[in-house]
Curated annotation (Swiss-Prot):
<dbReference type="InterPro" id="IPR017853">
    <property type="entry name" value="Glycoside_hydrolase_SF"/>
</dbReference>
<comment type="similarity">
    <text>Belongs to the glycosyl hydrolase 2 family.</text>
</comment>
<dbReference type="Pfam" id="PF18565">
    <property type="entry name" value="Glyco_hydro2_C5"/>
</dbReference>
<keyword id="KW-0378">Hydrolase</keyword>
<dbReference type="Pfam" id="PF02837">
    <property type="entry name" value="Glyco_hydro_2_N"/>
</dbReference>
<dbReference type="InterPro" id="IPR051913">
    <property type="entry name" value="GH2_Domain-Containing"/>
</dbReference>
<dbReference type="Pfam" id="PF02836">
    <property type="entry name" value="Glyco_hydro_2_C"/>
</dbReference>
<dbReference type="InterPro" id="IPR036156">
    <property type="entry name" value="Beta-gal/glucu_dom_sf"/>
</dbReference>
<feature type="active site" description="Nucleophile">
    <location>
        <position position="462"/>
    </location>
</feature>
<keyword id="KW-0326">Glycosidase</keyword>
<comment type="subunit">
    <text>Homodimer.</text>
</comment>
<protein>
    <recommendedName>
        <fullName>Beta-galactosidase</fullName>
        <ecNumber>3.2.1.23</ecNumber>
    </recommendedName>
</protein>
<dbReference type="InterPro" id="IPR006101">
    <property type="entry name" value="Glyco_hydro_2"/>
</dbReference>
<dbReference type="InterPro" id="IPR023230">
    <property type="entry name" value="Glyco_hydro_2_CS"/>
</dbReference>
<dbReference type="InterPro" id="IPR006102">
    <property type="entry name" value="Glyco_hydro_2_Ig-like"/>
</dbReference>
<dbReference type="InterPro" id="IPR040605">
    <property type="entry name" value="Glyco_hydro2_dom5"/>
</dbReference>
<dbReference type="InterPro" id="IPR023232">
    <property type="entry name" value="Glyco_hydro_2_AS"/>
</dbReference>
Length: 716
């Protein structure tokens, strides 16, 4: 049998842990909380990061039905930051180092069946311990604290399926195959004849395979492998058509049984010296890095919000890859990447610092836990086995690569560095290239970076970021240059076949330590802010999609004559995927058939339109002394107008835009959604310099995250 019971509601929390709390049963001084939970709610900015670097205590009064007395019972933690010590009825039963990977603690052997309630206690150390990655040195992000992911109770028979791994083969054949590897937990060393039932369904629930396998269960063997062949009419998983299959593995031996299910996809992902190939098709990778942090609550966001980030990256920014900087991220985020067709480069926790031998052991364990949790995700195409931007440590990294390849021989490894001529021990040379300062070349040639005389599989994993921090409320000129830097680098990536792609720094602004950022504990490095609201630079990525899917027409302007130095709006950069546009300035100037600037940007699929004085004269578009007029832009695709934008010469607050991402939330578990508030002008455009205070009131069984009075930031 298998029964998984979520235990996320009605925990009890105390922020000021004192020795002996693990034996306390009186919960009157504890706060009632639900998981995911942050150990302290932080301000949006200007706070002391030591606020969350505390030792806290969580308690859960646990009742397990008497009918499970003879079963094997585990508590499963998805993520606790950063060092967890677990107790049951005051008795220590286990611990875990590392805040980004899951762990299990067995409790059936110590559970007191005579008690109505057993007290589960988790002491959480969220201080920056130097023995746990990524801690030990300076870190350009915050790690927050608490039991910030979900917890569940797992109830099993003496023999149960601990994990399965699906390795697909022959993806170009008419009849495909796979190797199913089943990992068992055989706690009492049972032996005898065992039957495995394997069923595979497509995304519509249609059965595509069923077979029973009979074998012998060896008391000391815990891994069993089965070849499944002659799979017909199988559809490949791809970024455009992410076909997923569900596999269900049933097991029965003596009086014990179990069933384990997971999802997977048939696909081949390979980095080569001349680029990246997905299912034999060369694909230029275009992506951004993602931190899993949010305003106020840090990492502690539930499933819906984690999934929303994947939707933003894939469906709003039209990326085809994301890097999980700099740690394994929520299973809900990764599951959504599988569903949407968003490729993932997942890496271990770390940031520049390499610790002592004990620290390295934790890093090795983090790597094992990451891969065994996530090895069936078709979206994951690369394991990051190196501490981000660390110096070379050949012995350590040879071992990390060995571990990754032993656990998962089906994927390549990468190791992100910023140093050139680094020891190349992985399968893919992954490099943070910050060469571009707005003037010089956008990207280095790979041999200039690697120091090798031949090309190798090569991926740019960061660019821009700290080179040009930009706020959503910055002036138009700075935001325009921010756009151009992202544009130049993406264009250069597309023009160089030896570069598999480029992953920019980064998708969203994020909180950071005092040693970094703009002094207010925020790094404004994103193409969106912390609330996932777009900056102009997001249009570089947003526009890289077929107009058949979504026509895009986004000018980089507030449409104000005096916003830029000296004045005017020329050059006017317009990010679009239209064939051409038409410009109308008031009733005075009309220019037809303005085409994208393919001469300047030959690489990127959809280059921007740049309107300069070769296209329009100053007097045609409101020179000084002339009357400022409205702007109308019309985008055309295949000869038809598909999109139109208007900008007012005299914008005034006209609309209060209040739109939630979701209108229905779960009442049975912790849930959350974002509500976007904007002040718009008469044409529906954001008013970027309005900073009015808004007051938020909630009716019904919901709680606001953050303050109930906030000032608009850049109009939203």
């Amino acid at each position: 049998m298998r029964k998984i019971i979520p235990i996320n509601n009605n925990w009890y929390f105390k922020a000021d842990y004192e020795e002996g709390y693990e034996k306390v049963d009186d919960l009157r001084s504890f706060e009632n909380v639900n998981l995911p939970h942050t150990n302290i709610e932080l301000p949006y900015n200007y706070f002391d990061e030591k606020m969350y670097q505390i030792k806290s205590c969580y308690k859960y009064p646990l009742h397990i039905s008497e009918k499970y007395r003879d079963k094997v019972i585990y508590i499963h933690f998805e993520g606790v930051m950063a060092y967890a010590q677990v107790y049951l009825n005051g008795l220590y039963i286990g611990e875990h180092k590392g805040g980004y990977t899951p762990f299990d603690i067995r409790i059936d052997e110590v559970y007191d069946w005579k008690k109505e309630l057993n007290m589960l206690t988790v002491v959480v150390d969220s201080t920056e311990r130097s023995d746990i990655p990524p801690k030990g040195g300076q870190i350009d992000y915050l790690t927050y604290g608490g039991i910030y992911r979900e917890v569940s109770l797992g109830i099993y028979d003496d023999v149960f399926i601990k994990n399965i791994k699906v390795e697909t083969h022959g993806i170009y054949d008419n009849e495909k195959s796979l190797n199913l590897i089943v990992h068992l937990e055989n706690l009492n060393h049972q032996s005898g004849n065992v039957k495995f039932k394997v069923k595979i369904n497509d995304k519509n629930g249609k059965e595509v395979f069923y077979k029973e396998f009979n074998t012998y269960l060896d008391a000391v063997k815990d891994v069993y492998s089965f070849n499944i062949e002659n799979l017909k009419d199988i559809k490949l998983w791809d970024v455009d058509n992410p076909n997923l299959y569900e596999i269900k593995v049933g097991m029965k031996i003596n009086n014990f049984s179990d069933e384990y299910d997971n999802k997977f996809g048939f696909r081949e992902a390979v980095f080569k010296p001349d680029g990246f190939y997905l299912n034999g098709r060369k694909l230029k990778l275009r992506g951004l890095n993602r931190h899993q942090s949010y305003p106020y609550v840090g990492y502690a966001m539930p499933r819906r919000v984690q999934e929303k980030d994947a939707e933003i990256l894939k469906n709003e920014l039209h990326l085809n890859i994301v890097r999980t900087s700099h740690y394994p991220q929520s299973k809900h985020f990764l599951n959504k990447c599988d569903e949407l067709g968003l490729l993932v480069f997942e890496e271990i926790p770390g940031w520049q610092y390499i610790g002592n031998s004990e620290w390295k052991k934790v890093a090795e364990q983090n790597l094992r836990e990451m891969i065994t949790r996530d090895w069936n995700h078709p979206s994951i195409i690369l394991w990051g086995v190196r501490i981000n931007e660390s110096q070379d440590d050949d012995a350590f990294y040879k071992n990390m690569n060995k571990i990754a390849h032993e656990i998962d021989p089906t994927r390549q490894t990468g190791g992100v560095r910023y140093i050139t001529n680094s020891s190349f021990l992985e399968d893919v040379y992954t490099f943070n290239d910050f060469i571009h300062d707005g003037i010089n070349k956008p990207l280095r040639k790979q041999q200039e970076v690697t120091g090798l005389e031949h090309n190798v599989p090569y991926l740019v994993t960061e660019y821009n970021g700290h080179m040009y921090p930009t706020k959503r409320f910055d002036n138009e000129e700075r935001q325009m240059e921010h756009c151009l830097r992202h544009l130049r680098i993406q264009n250069a990536s597309y023009l160089d076949d030896s570069i598999s792609g480029a992953i920019g720094w980064c998708a969203f602004d994020y909180n950071t330590h005092k040693d970094f950022g703009s002094g207010d504990r925020i790094c404004y490095h994103g193409v969106m802010d912390m609330f996932r609201l777009p900056k102009f630079a997001s249009y570089v990525y947003k526009s890289q999609v077929s107009p058949d899917i979504e026509p895009i027409l986004e000018p980089v302007t507030f449409w104000a004559r005096g916003e830029r130095s000296i004045g005017g709006v020329i050059p006017l950069i317009i990010f679009t995927n239209c064939d051409y546009i038409e410009l109308q300035y008031g009733n005075k100037t009309k220019i037809d058939n303005i085409y994208p600037n393919r001469d300047a940007y030959k690489g990127i699929p959809y280059p921007p339109i740049i309107i300069d004085y070769d296209i329009v004269k100053p007097e045609m578009i409101g020179a000084w002394g002339m009357v400022w007029e409205d702007l109308t832009l019309k985008g055309f695709y295949k000869g038809n107008k598909v999109i139109e934008r208007k900008f007012s010469r005299e914008p005034i607050p006209t609309y209060l835009y209040v739109v939630p991402d979701d209108t229905i939330l779960s009442a049975t578990q912790k849930d959350a959604t974002r509500i976007v508030v904007k002040i718009l002008d008469q044409y529906g455009n954001l008013l970027p310099f309005i900073n009015e205070v808004i007051k938020i009131e909630i009716e019904g069984p919901a709680k606001l995250q953050g303050p109930n009075e906030v000032a608009l930031i850049g109009g939203a």
